[in-house]
Amino acid sequence: MEEELEKLNPERELTMEDLRRFRAECCLEYVVAQFRDKRSWRPGPEDWVRLYWAIDLVHANFTKRLQERVYLTDKELKIACLTKVKVQPTVIAWLFSCSLTDISMTRKRLYERITGERGSAPMFDLWMWKF
């Protein structure tokens, strides 16, 4: 009987870990949905904190790991996080009240700073999704 309980325990831990991960992903999706929805809403400081927290929960301290790799301004960190969760560049431009070209150039420059290689905005996106 004890052997059976020991065999079940790892499965139970896996199930609990899966549940924790699922909850974290649901939380992130809920937070990100606001950022993806172009309407009259503009994120406040608490919304950005909520976004960072949810991303870090799902993506193994993403913001901390990224900031340890390279210095980022507040705007650059926000663009990196929005890119990580696949918010469209047009929506990012709308959130920052700037042009799509401005966002594309920022993404390109960030890729070059982070990797030390010449690149493009789409290369930045791919790098963010893998990091």
Predicted regions and their residues:
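Cytosolic nucleotide-binding catalytic cores of signal-transduction proteins
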Residues: 42-131
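Membrane-proximal linker segments that couple transmembrane helices to downstream signaling/catalytic modules
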Residues: 1-75
